[in-house]
Amino acid sequence: MINLKIGQKLQLEIERMGINGEGIGVISGRLVFIPYALPGEEVLVEITENARNFSRAKLVKIIEKSPNRVKPQDRAYHEMSQSHIMHLSYPMQLEFKRDVMRQALEKYKPAGWRNYELRATLGMENTLGYRNKLQFQVRRLNDGTVIAGLYQEGTHHLVNLDNCLVQDPKTQEIINHICRLIEKFDLPVYDERKIGGIRTVMVRRSQKTGEVQIIFVTSTPIILDGQVWPELREEPSKRQKNSFVKFDKMLSALTEEFEEIVTVAVNFHPRKTSEIYGERTQVLFNEKETITEGVLDYEFELSPRAFYQLNSEQANVLYGEAVKALNPKKDDRVIDAYCGVGTIGFAVAKKVKSVHGMDITPESIFDAR
């Protein structure tokens, strides 16, 4: 097998795509993974990593371009992740997803896998603005500007996502406004090195009703109507008090600006971990404790922490196909494992004798009931 050196440049033909969306070329029997490269392309690459059985490389130049290559519309595309496939035409993205299933079957070989029929992936008409929920980290830059977004893969660099094209436009508008309010009221923002404050914001919008719920995740207590939450066992120092998040003005300004907001909650997460949420959540504002969402021919309630599919349009397609494939009978008893708020179970509930759901998230079970 050829010995490749870090920094070495070479020309490759891309033979296929890997499960993470990278192009794969082969040189003397050695696999080379190249993000952003597409099958059929002739490319110039630079080796960045060597493992025992494969290498990784960065794309330097496309010598011969694939007819399936398109220009990504999202300006943050190259900053966000090496596994994006927005440079691949949508029909071929659907074909790629089917190929991922084929690769998985060939690798894990479940019983009878050679007889499985891999049908065409069911796509959607509008491929932008479909994500009903965002969960962005928040940071303050040196000039005082507050940004919200996601970390660049493998780094601590937060990419500002102020116009993420796959997000529901209203959720994007709300998170942008929240950033401006944090600046206006000079609220503390989390810094992993020394400063406590707001660290993450979740915004979710019902595609059925347009209702919006928000969760602020903070590393320090908050102050609302003069009360500190969560309650402290001892008197905080002046420095600690300065990092408390004073929510009064923020909450009023936010709910006045967006009448769609029905729930605002805060989650206390003081630990330095990669987990998004802490154990304690407190509702600050609630016209309703939940938002009403719908799928197929039924509606259900979602509390802020409950899980639901990010793509409401495709959830309808997914659940519809699941019901058809299950072909439920009146005497059937169904177990909905990892049920979330019970959406799949509800889809068959009227067609079977009983449905039993189970999940590890108490909020999801509460909503399902």
Enumerate the predicted regions with their spans.
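Rossmann-like S-adenosyl-L-methionine
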Residues: I2-Q11, I19, T220-R369
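Short beta-strand elements
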Residues: G129-L141, V146-Q152, V203-S206, Q282-V295, ...
